[in-house]
UniProtKB/Swiss-Prot annotation:
Localization annotation: Cytoplasm
Organism of derivation: Streptococcus equi subsp. equi (strain 4047)
Protein's job: Excises uracil residues from the DNA which can arise as a result of misincorporation of dUMP residues by DNA polymerase or due to deamination of cytosine.
GO molecular function: uracil DNA N-glycosylase activity
Protein name in UniProt: Uracil-DNA glycosylase
Record's GO cellular component terms: cytoplasm
Catalytic activity: Hydrolyzes single-stranded DNA or mismatched double-stranded DNA and polynucleotides, releasing free uracil
HAMAP family: UDG
Name of the gene this protein is made from: ung
Length: 217
């Protein structure tokens, strides 16, 4: 289901039967409708970015709800798929902040220690936030709590009001939070553009001796 270190730590935070409840939920929703991402990719963020290698968290709300978009990594789509509006704005801000990146697939960020986590890990086709409040939030809150308990600094990048509410879970003063409005077209011009999250994260990582992320890779 998840990388073993994540699993071991998360199960210490959740009620004992919570993984079983998640599996029952997944069995039901995938058997009765079209759900994204593909089931094999539901936990991809935790599989690609091991706990011990996580340096940055970028928190999304839920997966893209159109065909072939969601990969199990927040904001990412395959390179063969047009960038959705929020991702277009993320790449526009990246270009202004550091440089041009010509890929829509953000897997290389995840492989460098950027945990691309959605607060809800599944979504019904065509229904944004359709699985909100059903099963996922305690699980993904547990992920944040596990990171909060780490004794090595993590940079939490929180975009938009929903993600910024999770700041209450980040109580360990060793960590760093970068927050701004969401990259959605509805809010990007209210402070996301010009917020320079990528260079700011790298400056923090460099200062902490953790090495920079190659955001253009």
């Amino acid at each position: 289901m998840t990388h073993s270190a994540w699993h071991d730590e998360i199960k210490q935070v959740l009620p004992k039967d919570y993984y079983r409840r998640i599996n029952r939920f997944l069995d039901e929703v995938y058997a009765t409708g079209v759900v994204y991402p593909p089931r094999d990719n539901v936990f991809k963020a935790l599989q690609v970015t091991p706990l011990e290698e996580t340096r940055v968290l970028i928190l999304g709300q839920d997966p893209y709800h159109g065909p072939l978009q969601a990969q199990g990594l927040s904001f990412s789509v395959p390179d063969s798929i047009p960038a959705p509006p929020s991702l277009q704005n993320i790449l526009e801000e990246l270009a202004a902040d550091i440089g041009v990146r010509n890929h829509h697939d953000l897997s290389s960020w995840a492989e460098q220690g950027v945990l691309l986590l959605n607060a809800c890990l599944t979504v019904p086709e065509g229904r944004a936030n359709g699985h909100a409040g059903l099963i996922w939030e305690p699980f993904t809150d547990a992920v944040i709590k596990v990171l909060n308990a780490k004794d090595r600094p993590v940079v939490f990048i929180l975009w938009g009001a929903y993600a910024r509410r999770k700041k209450a879970l980040i109580t360990n003063p060793i960590h760093h939070v970068i927050e701004s409005p969401h990259p959605s077209p509805l809010s990007a011009y209210r402070g996301f553009f010009g917020s320079k999250p990528f260079s700011r994260a790298n400056a923090i990582l460099e200062k902490e001796g953790l090495g920079q992320i190659d955001w253009l890779r």
